[in-house]
């Protein structure tokens, strides 16, 4: 009986996602799994020459500054 109970507990632990982490885009196609304390995905524009802008993406603890910041808290929301 103890063996059955232990088996059920182990299966439950393996099936549950006890350590949920956020996944954000780091580049245009590249993704990164955020650290547990990073709860925000961000995207903002870095001014470049000739009126162009380079997007910066990643994980953070708060919404950063920058041109046209976009911050969100769901997986892959900073495309």
Swiss-Prot record:
Pfam family for this entry, one: Toxin_cobra-type
GO cellular component: extracellular region
Lineage top rank: taxon: Eukaryota
Keywords: Acetylcholine receptor inhibiting toxin, Disulfide bond, Ion channel impairing toxin, Neurotoxin, Postsynaptic neurotoxin, Secreted, Signal, Toxin
Chief location bin: secreted
InterPro entries reported in the protein's UniProt record: Snake_3FTx, Snake_toxin-like_sf, Toxin_cobra-type
Annotated family: Belongs to the three-finger toxin family. Short-chain subfamily. Type III alpha-neurotoxin sub-subfamily.
Protein name according to UniProt: Short neurotoxin 2
Species per Swiss-Prot/TrEMBL record: Pseudonaja textilis
């Amino acid at each position: 009986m103890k063996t059955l109970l232990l088996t059920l507990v182990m299966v439950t632990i393996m099936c549950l996602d006890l350590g949920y982490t956020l996944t954000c885009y780091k580049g245009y196609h590249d993704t990164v799994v955020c650290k547990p304390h990073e709860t925000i995905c961000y995207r903002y524009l870095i001014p470049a020459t000739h009126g162009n802008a380079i997007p910066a993406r990643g994980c953070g603890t708060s919404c950063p500054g920058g041109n046209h910041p976009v911050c969100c808290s769901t997986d892959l929301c900073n495309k």
